[in-house]
Amino acid sequence: MRTAPSLRRCVCLLLAAILDLARGYLTVNIEPLPPVVAGDAVTLKCNFKTDGRMREIVWYRVTDGGTIKQKIFTFDAMFSTNYSHMENYRKREDLVYQSTVRLPEVRISDNGPYECHVGIYDRATREKVVLASGNIFLNVMAPPTSIEVVAADTPAPFSRYQAQNFTLVCIVSGGKPAPMVYFKRDGEPIDAVPLSEPPAASSGPLQDSRPFRSLLHRDLDDTKMQKSLSLLDAENRGGRPYTERPSRGLTPDPNILLQPTTENIPETVVSREFPRWVHSAEPTYFLRHSRTPSSDGTVEVRALLTWTLNPQIDNEALFSCEVKHPALSMPMQAEVTLVAPKGPKIVMTPSRARVGDTVRILVHGFQNEVFPEPMFTWTRVGSRLLDGSAEFDGKELVLERVPAELNGSMYRCTAQNPLGSTDTHTRLIVFENPNIPRGTEDSNGSIGPTGARLTLVLALTVILELT
């Protein structure tokens, strides 16, 4: 009686072995793949071992966390045929060795898990199929497609009396995974303090406990320093720079004169403003990153570099944003040079303004490359603008139906960015218009009371002659 359980156990093991022999032997494994770059050819290998007769091999694309399996390729051993289920992909995959699928140009959308299912016939009956499967994760990388450096909160005015914070934004798009972004100044990496939140706009100059290193010996222009201090002395003595009240008799240096754009414009005065304060230490930089996923699976990275701007040191400084990414063979880079506006070029149309014309005065560039984008303010020296306003913000000043009274009037254009400010003065010469009798227009360029009375008399004369 005691031997009965042992006998039954032996019989069960024997039957299991017989069933295994009947079903056949089948194991499946897929070789792991390192991350691949979009556009490369990828081969998914499904290795299997069996002593049975193969029925089919099916590849699946797994989506939605494994809840959906999309059949992408099938090899039917019964009919020795294979066909694609990826109609939307226009049969991009090829079955190389019955157990291998090749994607000639992998895409970011191909990223994700895949499964290979292999089926063999049961040896006991051909109506049953024994299945085994393996899985692999295809990690598709994509290098960044664009990089750009811009200034935040621009255009912005130049601060003459106090320091202000300045932020450069490096925008990197199209990368997967997110790239590493960092800044350099004049070719040297910037040791920045990481920030998780943006600094408050009203927090004042940014500070850090780390020791400062002086930059005066490296970047400060003694000429700029002396001129800045001379302007400060003039202000303390009660005087003002001539650029704020230009004189009609002033003859500026011909080297800085702009070419006149209309006839008989006698002078164009260019000035440059400098700050009334000077820093003597290297600024502390603060760096903050943000990441925004895109619908195509890539990530947009924004790196924000903030520091307390010092125009004496930062003007003409070269800042570069560099990107490192596993899909790039070398870093990606974008550069900007911080430059204050200098020597605005003014174009006036028409070239010969007459009474009643609409005159346009446009800033048509600078003598240098300016960054960040400047803001423009127009004023009329000694009076208000034609429309009665004190000033106008914009790149182009439009004077509609100019009257003769504007002949000889001077206009000031102030171009400024956080690095500095420059003033340009130009004089408007208005010529007589033979189509408009002298004295018949008012200050707005329209027909005045005298012209109206003359028109009325002529009309009455014509009516009387007709009657």
Swiss-Prot record:
Residues 229-259 are annotated as: Disordered. This is Immunoglobulin superfamily member 21. The keyword Disulfide bond applies. The gene is IGSF21. GO terms for cellular component: adherens junction; external side of plasma membrane; inhibitory synapse; postsynaptic density membrane; presynaptic membrane. Changing residue 467 to M: In a colorectal cancer sample; somatic mutation. The keyword Signal applies. Involved in synaptic inhibition in the brain. Selectively regulates inhibitory presynaptic differentiation through interacting with presynaptic NRXN2. It comes from the Eukaryota. It is found in: Postsynaptic cell membrane. Glycans are attached at residues 82, 165, 407, 444. It comes from Homo sapiens. Pfam families: V-set. Disulfide bonds join 46-116. Residues 234-247 have a biased composition (Basic and acidic residues). Its main location: membrane. It is a lipid-anchor; GPI-anchor.
